[in-house]
Swiss-Prot record:
Described function: One of two assembly initiator proteins, it binds directly to the 5'-end of the 23S rRNA, where it nucleates assembly of the 50S subunit.
Oligomer status and interactors: Part of the 50S ribosomal subunit.
Entry keyword set: Ribonucleoprotein, Ribosomal protein, RNA-binding, rRNA-binding
Lineage: Bacteria, Pseudomonadati, Pseudomonadota, Gammaproteobacteria, Enterobacterales
Family affiliation: Belongs to the universal ribosomal protein uL24 family.
Name this protein carries in UniProt: Large ribosomal subunit protein uL24
GO biological process: translation
A GO molecular-function annotation: rRNA binding
CDD domains xref list: KOW_RPL26 (cd06089)
Disulfide bonds: none
Gene3D superfamilies the UniProt entry points to: 2.30.30.30
Amino acid sequence: MAAKIRRDDEVIVLTGKDKGKRGKVKNVLSSGKVIVEGINLVKKHQKPVPALNQPGGIVEKEAAIQVSNVAIFNATTGKADRVGFRFEDGKKVRFFKSNSETIK
């Protein structure tokens, strides 16, 4: 099945502590999760690695979030939207369901 949400899409979080926040998808994982810039930040306690000259400490990084908890953001309507698929000139393309506008 084709992916409805892909890398570099702007998404909006639907549920959880970051509900309503928007961000850009950095990575889509095969486990049905996505990593979004600035969303679901967690603190990781990292040990120093002297061989790589890396200091230790507490590092903030983005954790994965379920793809079902995000929706693609439609810039023309300013709201979250659903994604559909259709064929244009023999190619399968994604489109917004609310206004039938093709995505990128």
